[in-house]
């Protein structure tokens, strides 16, 4: 999935236009801090949108429907999750995820909700948003050995971490991420590839600066990310373009898939002149649209 667009649940205009954004995944955002009355209305709007587009998505396969909920240290995350699950989303993005225990707790609640709603067990995926606070950033590495099977991707929170550490900038000279943020970002990419799941880049929020946005997306792809979050439909085309596979990448993916098809039980194979692990097989299948 190349483009993931984040849609504020309280923004009626944005929700109405979401289906036409062209993004591969539409994420209805229920994690934004709002007044209680607005929060309740946002949940209703999110639930209604997810329900309304459920059959359309199943029939046409145009986009996936996701919801972003507040962290499990908030008082209203269960209400947000309940509203989202009424529409049977493809998955949940967990904001301010503190680590593996948060993921396990969310997975356990999802199992109960799926059973109550008559959904297939474990059908709802999870993408944790990591590194919002210093202590959370330091715990990211543990996910390499303790990742729940529901987790299909990882993303991160540059702005949240920058605020938490009192950083005065997100990027340094040349547009490079400042060192603490780059550390978190690198862990997200490495763990995602180690586990054969998606690595999703933090959004570029200056909607008016398309040229810089394109460069940011191209850099993210060059650094190993598989997709990126958009905050406006205008960003979707250049995200999709930046993350489109090259002919050489498609050719290599075909060779990897063919090699493992011929020897499906092998833990690794030599393809061309290099050793290929099974985690690369998963990535090759995703690249070819087989996953």
Model-derived segments and spans:
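Expand to "…catalyze enediolate/carbanion chemistry for C-C bond making/breaking, isomerization
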Residues: 1-291
């Amino acid at each position: 999935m190349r483009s993931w667009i984040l849609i504020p649940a309280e923004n009626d205009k944005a929700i109405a236009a979401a289906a036409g954004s062209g993004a591969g995944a539409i994420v209805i955002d229920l994690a934004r801090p709002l007044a209680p009355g607005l929060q309740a209305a946002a949940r209703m709007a999110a639930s209604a949108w997810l329900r309304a587009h459920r059959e359309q998505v199943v029939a046409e396969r145009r986009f996936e429907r996701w919801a972003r909920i507040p962290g499990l240290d908030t008082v209203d995350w269960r209400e947000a999750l309940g509203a989202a699950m009424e529409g049977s989303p493809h998955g949940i993005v967990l904001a301010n995820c503190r680590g593996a225990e948060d993921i396990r707790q969310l997975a356990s609640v999802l199992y109960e909700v799926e059973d109550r709603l008559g959904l297939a067990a474990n059908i709802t995926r999870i993408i944790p948003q990591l590194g919002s606070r210093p202590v959370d950033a330091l715990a990211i590495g543990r996910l390499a050995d303790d990742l729940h099977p529901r987790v299909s991707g990882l993303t991160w929170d540059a702005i949240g971490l920058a605020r938490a550490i009192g950083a005065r900038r997100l990027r340094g000279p040349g547009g490079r991420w400042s060192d603490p943020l780059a550390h978190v970002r690198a862990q997200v990419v490495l763990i995602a590839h180690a586990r054969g799941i998606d690595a999703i880049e933090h959004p570029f929020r200056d909607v008016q600066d398309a040229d810089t946005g394109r460069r940011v997306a191209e850099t993210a792809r060059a650094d190993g990310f598989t997709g990126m979050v958009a905050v406006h439909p205008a960003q979707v085309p250049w995200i999709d373009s930046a993350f489109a596979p090259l002919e050489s990448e498609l050719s290599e993916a075909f060779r990897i898939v063919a090699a493992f098809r011929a020897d499906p039980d092998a833990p690794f194979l030599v393809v061309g002149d290099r050793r290929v692990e099974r985690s690369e097989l998963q990535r090759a299948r995703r690249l070819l649209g087989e996953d």
